[in-house]
Amino acid sequence: MKQNKNQKNTAVNQITEGVIWKQLLIFFFPILFGTLFQQIYNTADTVVVGRFVGKEALAAVGGSSSMIVNLIVGFFVGLCSGASVVISQFYGAKDHKNLKKALHTSMIFCLAASIIVGTAGFILAEPILHLMKTPAEVIPDSVLYLHIYFAGTFFNLVYNMVSSILRAVGDSKRPLYVLIITCLLNILLDVVFVVIFHMGVLGVALATVSCQAVSAILVTWFLMRAEDIYRLEFHEIRFDLRSLGAVLRIGLPAGLESVMYNIANLTIQIFVNELGTDTVAAWGTMGKIDAVFWMVCNAFAISITTFVGQNYGAGKYHRMRKSVRVCMVMAYISAFIVSGALILFANPIYHLFTTDQVVVDIGVHMIRFLIPSYAIYVVIGIISGALRGAGRVLVPMILTCGGVCLLRIIWLFAFVRSHPGIDSIMLSYPVSWIITAVLFVIYYFRRFPGMQL
């Protein structure tokens, strides 16, 4: 039995030891492939409804509905990052007692939150769609999709919480295996429900929730079978106020940051909705296409958060600082490669989603206008992830909410109202990123732990 435990431990990346760039890549690639399959998982819905149902269904799944899901679920995912940071620090410090308390407190908190998030999403879906000025022909399918999605919120939140716990201890492989399985299952169910049984948006929503249920069950089973200190044991699931406080201290700012991001995106969606169904469909599809860039950037951000968290817990400040520099270089190399590919193949990529040439033309213009500025965000993503791993979350949240979210909203009402059009809307992204990136760099060099050493 002891031998099995040791074998299990060797499967977990030793983040506090070894060559930094190699250890970062060992941890990064499973997250990258995981986010890739997550993107394929999400994109399958859009491709199927776009090609086999119509542009109204495409707008329903990929437009305002996507924004609402990101707003409500994104807040909880931010809270999950709090659990991830706390557990990674305890794991790095080999504090077994507090790690167990944080893990089991996080799980019961997840159960309680799923009830609140699911209920709120179900009730508020239609009013928010109207508030966002969603085109009338899109609203019925959007409401149907959101009601089914939020009815299955429990599975989505459980998967996100357990996956964040596994990554916190350096296990980025098993969440990847789960995503591969559920991604293939989602594509199969999309084809069966939509192409064969002609269930439209209803079929896409049912396929999504079914796969979320499978993913939640699988990752929970992995955590229950773990032969290490992070094993989930149902009889130990209870609230520990100190652990909950530590999780919320880090998770709440991250959750609020996510909410502010999505409020800004919701506001942008309102302005986009005023430009008609073709632009709404193109913008929603753009969100699926540029997610290829975000999955790379976010994979590096998740990697550096866990990397900094464990080394911070172990007191290895020099290694922690060096890892940020290494991660930044790798993230920029990847960002330039992905951005170039998206710009070069913009037209054929859009044709994968829809045969409507008007939508394709609008979408290709969006990619070529906006994608070149995405590299600016890399600074924000990596530094924010590093600061979060060290437990520094309040000021980064303020910088993000003010520099990105608030400034973007001000731009929309101050500039876009007098200069209407999709180009004016998209310009809010690089303007807000440049200002926020400068603020993050200044804060990092002044306040990151160990910079004075």
Predicted segments — roles?
Residues 17, 21-40, 44, 68-75, ...:
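Residue-level signal for short hydrophobic patches within transmembrane helices
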Residues 53-67, 142, 146, 205, ...:
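Small-residue hotspots at the loop-to-helix junctions and early N-terminal turns
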Residues 36, 40-59, 129-136, 192-199, ...:
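Helix-terminus/linker motif at the lipid-water interface of multi-pass membrane proteins
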Residues 26-45, 148, 159, 182, ...:
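Transmembrane helical elements of multi-pass membrane transporters/channels
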